[in-house]
Amino acid sequence: MADRLIVKGAREHNLRSVDLDLPRDALIVFTGLSGSGKSSLAFDTIFAEGQRRYVESLSAYARQFLGQMDKPDVDFIEGLSPAVSIDQKSTNRNPRSTVGTITEVYDYLRLLYARAGTPHCPTCGERVARQTPQQIVDQVLAMPEGTRFLVLAPVVRTRKGEFADLFDKLNAQGYSRVRVDGVVHPLTDPPKLKKQEKHDIEVVVDRLTVKAAAKRRLTDSVETALNLADGIVVLEFVDHELGAPHREQRFSEKLACPNGHALAVDDLEPRSFSFNSPYGACPECSGLGIRKEVDPELVVPDPDRTLAQGAVAPWSNGHTAEYFTRMMAGLGEALGFDVDTPWRKLPAKARKAILEGADEQVHVRYRNRYGRTRSYYADFEGVLAFLQRKMSQTESEQMKERYEGFMRDVPCPVCAGTRLKPEILAVTLAGESKGEHGAKSIAEVCELSIADCADFLNALTLGPREQAIAGQVLKEIRSRLGFLLDVGLEYLSLSRAAATLSGGEAQRIRLATQIGSGLVGVLYVLDEPSIGLHQRDNRRLIETLTRLRDLGNTLIVVEHDEDTIEHADWIVDIGPGAGEHGGRIVHSGPYDELLRNKDSITGAYLSGRESIEIPAIRRSVDPRRQLTVVGAREHNLRGIDVSFPLGVLTSVTGVSGSGKSTLVNDILAAVLANRLNGARQVPGRHTRVTGLDYLDKLVRVDQSPIGRTPRSNPATYTGVFDKIRTLFAATTEAKVRGYQPGRFSFNVKGGRCEACTGDGTIKIEMNFLPDVYVPCEVCQGARYNRETLEVHYKGKTVSEVLDMSIEEAAEFFEPIAGVHRYLRTLVDVGLGYVRLGQPAPTLSGGEAQRVKLASELQKRSTGRTVYILDEPTTGLHFDDIRKLLNVINGLVDKGNTVIVIEHNLDVIKTSDWIIDLGPEGGAGGGTVVAQGTPEDVAAVPASYTGKFLAEVVGGGASAATSRSNRRRNVSA
């Protein structure tokens, strides 16, 4: 096999016929400015060709079921292995997927519990066991010789009826006695039972005494009883006193409770422990573990309001508001309160009645349109029951969304959120966790953090038989948990829903899964695996990447993290600029040579020739103007109070899983969206948020796509295309033809090409070959019909304008202030290289986030806006971060507030204020470790962020020195 990976003539997207010679079995980092061509080379060229060649080796029948990829625009690639892509976009949104299921650890846990678990009765907690007839006989013969007993077959257990037919049938089969409700009767004269009472009936199969000579007879009697009673036999030891605990002993061929409690499971199989299978799933919630319930906190979001002012939110708007206010006034007459009393001051009895309903009818009075007083009596349902009823009755998606705004996902009341049947939750394994010895169910093990789960399974106490059965399974589980620990995910639990994972967490889970697969000779292409990872955990991620390399694989990592770049075997810097100014190889070689490369912007920042400066003076914080979250207790937050100063740039930091997103996104952003933007979101649990009166708008910028279809693009999303279409409609030619702005839209009939409905391409299905997209023969890819394209603005058609880069378009429309302002903002956030009409699905998460940011930036600022950004540096080069910080600081300089969740030290060190959560992730986090200026936080020994920040802000260290210090720390 060739020891080099050679690429010749790569021209995908903006690549300029790139030639590249890379070592195999190495850790290779692709870096460069955003839009320089890194992903085009790594994913769209090398990975695409590797996957295409592998799929082409399969049969035509197999290929038709696989989503194939088009052949990339490249002359040839040599030394290519089967390729695996690990990106951030394929996060599983299925509510049934968990960390345990996607890593397959849960599959092995199911096998472990099915084969080595100890079942118990969920009612009484007694151990449940199954025995063969021979085991039962041996156990009886081990008792003292001469012990007398009856062999009973329980044929009826706590059932109503007279059972006369059963007595006749048993008598006909040759049995002579039967025990009914503890009393033995002859079958020749059975008792007359009351039909409406529950009874226990056991057939007396035999009377025996313990002695060796009775072994054959005992075996026959036990087998007869087991057959008669569906696998259960009861022995009554007649020499013991009535009511004595050992007078009766129950044996079963199946899983059975010794105290006779019914079990809904016969045999334990791996599927019995699956919440996605009817054999194991809780019947109440079908294995989801949650259900929606009305939350009184959401029904009454502001307890300082009166009922007349709309304290009860579902009854405060619309044409029914007056009706419900009258109803509550009627209730007030009966209970002694009035609707002008704040909710907080209402008697507990009144609040309970409004929420849950009244037992008596209420007397409702009102004035009709003629001014006459009228009255009637009506039932008062209560707002909670009202919402549940409306939710179950409506078929309107809009109304469902409205009612769900007053509900939370709460744990299922039957399984308490564990998703499994009670019988399955009663199967345990004994082990040790955090120094405490005890038995845990599979659900309890999955609730542990991955670190604690690994400790528990390492300390399992198994007998020789169970150890022999479980040895190989435990080896697989421990191995997979070890890989998850290696990539810095020890704070997650196996029960964590996949839909709640960040892109970085999901990517690292897939990375751990790939290491667990043990494949060699594979080409792995990764997209920024360090996203969402604190500097503290970088070392373990780098060790994981090198371990994957050492197995005999080639890794190509698209990355901006300086620690990862420094530890790479080979670095490819693509640039020198972005878009049309990029697409060339600036550097291909080891790290030391990159630092000396004068043409490399990356090398300039890493060597310290360029740097992002720490501000000489930070903005002062006014303690009187703060946004304060009181009693934040969602997920792992421990009832903390956190104040966000207004009018400054605040970074929320902390290790992965410390509670940053929960605090900022789930609580603060949701409350602000509801109060300032009129949204109907469900905030995380908290007591209250103060300081809202200082603000008038929330702008939340995340990395979700700006659109799901190719018809959405930066021009349409920002709204600049509306102005461009208006310009075209104002041309002389358009006026002569009577064209309106709608004529220049590719989404509606009139101006678009109808052959391709405005897509510009035609999809040709090729069955087992990849679908082929060819330019539309009618419009030649221009999207518009011939008549529309005959209209020109300054010599350009509307199609040619959409094909311009944003930088070109900004220059083209410079005289038109209304258009230029939009485009200039896109250039300012580093998107000058993106085409104005570039389809939304082709934009990365970081690019989509910056399009949203630009869309908000061009709006008129009030100086009272709060901007919330979630890791805005994702996908950004050092130089792009500098541009982003200029934009953010411009917002703050106008009096606005910017809150960012961030791990990037360049952003953190330039912040005015830092709120550091932790100290650890998961259960070990959820508290405020430090807050203050970067210098204040750097001085806090308990803060991991402060430790790394001290190397950047402490003692006026230069950028180059601080980076050198950090690399030594990571290497340690």
Curated annotation (Swiss-Prot):
Binding site for ATP: 32-39, 654-661
Domain of life: Bacteria
Protein's name according to its UniProt entry: UvrABC system protein A
Cross-referenced Pfam families: UvrA_DNA-bind, UvrA_inter
One GO biological process term: SOS response
Function as written in the Swiss-Prot or TrEMBL entry: The UvrABC repair system catalyzes the recognition and processing of DNA lesions. UvrA is an ATPase and a DNA-binding protein. A damage recognition complex composed of 2 UvrA and 2 UvrB subunits scans DNA for abnormalities. When the presence of a lesion has been verified by UvrB, the UvrA molecules dissociate. Alone it slightly inhibits RecA-mediated DNA strand exchange, in concert with UvrD1 greatly inhibits RecA-mediated DNA strand exchange.
InterPro entries in alphabetical order: ABC_transporter-like_ATP-bd, ABC_transporter-like_CS, P-loop_NTPase, UvrA, UvrA_DNA-bd, UvrA_inter
TM region positions: none
Disruption phenotype: Greatly increased sensitivity to UV light, mitomycin C, slightly less sensitive to nitrosative and oxidative stress; a double uvrA/uvrD1 mutant is even more sensitive. Single uvrA mutant is only slightly attenuated in mouse infection, the double uvrA/uvrD1 mutant is strongly attenuated at all stages of infection.
GO CC annotation: cytosol; excinuclease repair complex; peptidoglycan-based cell wall; plasma membrane
Subunit structure: Forms a heterotetramer with UvrB during the search for lesions. Interacts with RecA.
Ranges annotated as C4-type zinc finger: 257-285, 753-779
UniProt KW keywords: ATP-binding, Cytoplasm, DNA damage, DNA excision, DNA repair, DNA-binding, Excision nuclease, Metal-binding, Nucleotide-binding, Repeat, SOS response, Zinc, Zinc-finger
Family designation: Belongs to the ABC transporter superfamily. UvrA family.
Any one GO MF annotation of this record: ATP binding
Annotated localization: Cytoplasm
All copies of domain ABC transporter, residue ranges: 315-601, 621-950
Organism of origin: Mycobacterium tuberculosis (strain ATCC 25618 / H37Rv)
